[in-house]
């Protein structure tokens, strides 16, 4: 036993090279050897590598190894070792599970690369390009006149930009600014050159204007206006082609309002609560408005008067007579039209001078040409629109000296569309456009174009500017 305790001397020998800074007591060093020998597999992973190397230095001496072997064998025979063995298995799996999480982050950088691979955002600009495609310019028409061989075409030199809606009244007129100016181009089909406009007779040249939607697909010349008290005007635009003559759209304007349409229902005076049967009026008599102040179901009257014929007689009040037995089909259709559609009349959305005569004018470069100036055009409702210009020669083909007006049909020799312009409400209107040099040039030649005077002094110029904006 004494020999077993002498190893501390050996430990004092060995720590010399291993522990240069501090020499622990021999008992403490021996305990470190026992701790290192009892759980070598379990304590290897938790402690740092430096402690493993420091504890690994003392084991070389043989006496501690024999004692450690005896101790380890003694621990295997003792009951505590099974408890140590139960603690040993959980540690190794933790050592193997730790590297796996380090391997899992590796696939994480792969998904970002996959996210970078699909380029749906790059495909998103393509729809925007498709939205830009509808902004095509509607096609223009250019034809050659029979008999003369002249080819006519239209060129909108001054495009409309904006306007303020004028509403459904006739007093407040807000012209489109700047006024559209269209130049008529005439080319000789034989020579391919423009004709001399100074020698051309333009007295029978006429340009008509229509209002179209912003894409130039359909016309929107009509708009329904509501005339009822306290009701605003509708901004639904319509075209002439959608309103067929066979439909009762125009006939309904002559029909009475909703009050009178409900009033004929009392022609039979089915108000038994107010009037006795002896006082009831006949079918042909028109009751006063006082008797029709309260509306009730007309069927209440007929069962109580067996003396009257249930079939309505042929009278002027027949079409408007309403009962549960004999009803006029035409009257029903008219009543259905009045009931389903709101009150109001169709009116033109584009108002003003919708046809213009030609003028021989000089442009800003003092070059003569045939021009159409449309300075009196207004739009009732707000929105984005286009103008379609159609040129017609109402004179005889050939343009002889004895000018005569064509009494039949005149073909459209040229047509074109303007760029889209915006019509604003009174609150959103940014103001009229500045007068252009072309407008000023035409105004000096006698064309009635509203020109805003350029002056910095308070006076007529400022008053005119305020008048245009208000």
Curated annotation (Swiss-Prot):
One Gene Ontology cellular component annotation held by this UniProt entry: cytoplasm
Residues forming coiled coils: none
Positions of the UniProt region annotated as Disordered: 1-148, 223-321
Keywords tagged on the record: Cytoplasm, Nucleus, Sporulation, Transcription, Transcription regulation
Subcellular location per the Swiss-Prot or TrEMBL entry: Nucleus; Cytoplasm
Biased composition (Pro residues): 38-49, 102-124
Stored InterPro entries: Velvet, Velvet_dom, Velvet_dom_sf
Gene3D superfamilies reported in the protein's UniProt record: Velvet domain (2.60.40.3960)
Domain Velvet per the UniProt entry, residue ranges: 147-452
Positions of transmembrane segments: none
Basic residues biased stretches: 74-86
Chief location: nucleus
Role, per record: Component of the velvet transcription factor complex that controls sexual/asexual developmental ratio in response to light, promoting sexual development in the darkness while stimulating asexual sporulation under illumination. The velvet complex acts as a global regulator for secondary metabolite gene expression. Component of the velB-VosA heterodimeric complex that plays a dual role in activating genes associated with spore maturation and repressing certain development-associated genes.
Family: Belongs to the velvet family. VelB subfamily.
Lineage: Eukaryota, Fungi, Dikarya, Ascomycota, Pezizomycotina
UniProt protein name: Velvet complex subunit B
Pfam families xref list: Velvet
Cystine connections: none
Subunit structure: Component of the heterotrimeric velvet complex composed of laeA, veA and velB; VeA acting as a bridging protein between laeA and velB. Forms a heterodimeric complex with vosA; the formation of the velB-vosA complex is light-dependent.
Source organism per UniProt: Gibberella zeae (strain ATCC MYA-4620 / CBS 123657 / FGSC 9075 / NRRL 31084 / PH-1) (Wheat head blight fungus)
């Amino acid at each position: 036993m004494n020999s077993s305790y002498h190893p501390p001397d050996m430990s004092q020998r060995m720590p010399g090279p291993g522990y240069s800074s501090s020499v622990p007591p021999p008992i403490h060093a021996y305990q470190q050897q026992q701790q290192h020998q009892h759980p070598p597999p379990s304590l290897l992973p938790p402690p740092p590598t430096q402690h493993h190397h420091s504890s690994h230095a003392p084991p070389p001496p043989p006496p501690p190894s024999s004692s450690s072997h005896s101790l380890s064998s003694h621990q295997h025979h003792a009951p505590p070792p099974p408890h140590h063995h139960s603690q040993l298995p959980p540690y190794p799996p933790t050592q193997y599970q730790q590297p796996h999480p380090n391997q899992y982050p590796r696939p994480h950088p792969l998904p970002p690369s996959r996210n970078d691979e699909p380029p749906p955002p790059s495909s998103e600009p393509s729809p925007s390009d498709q939205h830009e495609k509808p902004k095509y310019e509607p096609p223009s028409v250019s034809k050659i006149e029979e008999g003369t061989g002249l080819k006519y075409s239209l060129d909108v030199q001054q495009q409309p930009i904006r306007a303020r809606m004028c509403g459904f009244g006739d007093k407040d007129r807000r012209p489109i600014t700047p006024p559209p100016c269209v130049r008529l181009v005439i080319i000789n089909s034989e020579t391919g050159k423009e004709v001399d406009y100074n020698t051309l007779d333009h007295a029978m040249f006429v340009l008509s204007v229509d209002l179209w939607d912003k894409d130039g697909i359909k016309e929107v010349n009509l708009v329904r206006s509501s005339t009822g008290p306290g009701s605003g005007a509708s901004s639904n635009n319509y075209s002439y082609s959608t309103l067929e003559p066979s439909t009762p759209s125009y006939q309904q304007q002559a029909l009475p309002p909703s009050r009178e349409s409900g009033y004929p229902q009392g022609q039979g005076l089915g108000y038994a609560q107010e009037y006795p049967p002896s006082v009831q009026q006949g079918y042909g008599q028109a009751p006063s408005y006082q008797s029709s102040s309260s509306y009730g179901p007309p069927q209440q009257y007929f069962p109580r008067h067996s003396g009257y014929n249930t079939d309505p007689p042929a009278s002027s009040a027949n079409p408007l007579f309403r009962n549960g037995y004999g009803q006029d089909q035409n009257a029903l259709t008219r009543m259905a039209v009045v009931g389903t559609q709101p009150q109001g009349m169709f009116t033109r959305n584009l108002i003003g001078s919708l046809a213009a005569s030609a003028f021989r004018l000089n442009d800003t470069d003092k070059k003569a040409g045939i021009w159409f100036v449309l300075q009196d055009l207004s739009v009732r409702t707000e929105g984005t629109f286009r103008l379609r210009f159609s040129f017609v020669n109402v004179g005889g083909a050939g343009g002889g000296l004895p000018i005569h007006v064509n009494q039949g049909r005149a073909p459209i020799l040229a047509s074109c569309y303007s760029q889209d312009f915006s019509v604003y409400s009174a609150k959103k209107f940014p103001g009229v456009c500045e007068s252009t040099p072309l407008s000023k040039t035409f105004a000096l030649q006698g064309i009635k174009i509203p020109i805003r005077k350029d002056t910095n002094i308070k006076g007529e110029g400022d008053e005119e500017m305020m008048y245009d904006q208000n």
